[in-house]
């Protein structure tokens, strides 16, 4: 990891054994003091208590969290009180958009047809690695 040189570290990670608590206190100490940490993947990629400690000690320039651990974040969680920290609600997939719902339904219909015809399914997630491999 190139943490000491990075101005911005953006986490867009799936929840897997390999990414669980990837960013801990030891790694946070390697960040530049003015570095920004963004997490838009899964909350458990960061050890929450370690992040709180590192920010309070001034080891980061700012934090943006679209995801947290736990999620939802309790009203008394210390993350809400951190300086230079922005927390937004994690809304995956924009299911409020009609085109998103249509996409999901169309993929499901296509996969039912493929399954019935012994064809390869679309968007299959590899349970070992925790995400869809590009084909």
Region locations from a protein language model:
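C-terminal helix-to-coil terminal segments
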Residues: 71-135
């Amino acid at each position: 990891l190139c943490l000491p040189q990075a101005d911005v570290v953006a986490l867009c990670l799936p929840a897997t054994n390999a990414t669980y608590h990837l960013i801990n206190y030891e790694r946070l100490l390697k960040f530049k003091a003015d570095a920004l940490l963004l997490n838009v993947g899964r909350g458990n990629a960061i050890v929450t208590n370690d992040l709180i400690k590192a920010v309070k000690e001034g080891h980061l320039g700012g934090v943006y969290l679209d995801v947290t651990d736990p999620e939802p974040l309790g009203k008394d969680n210390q993350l809400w009180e951190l300086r230079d920290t922005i927390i937004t609600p994690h809304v995956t997939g924009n299911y409020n958009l009609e085109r998103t719902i249509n996409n999901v339904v169309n993929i499901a219909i296509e996969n039912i047809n493929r399954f019935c015809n012994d064809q390869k399914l679309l968007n299959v997630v590899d349970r070992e690695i925790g995400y869809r491999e590009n084909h």
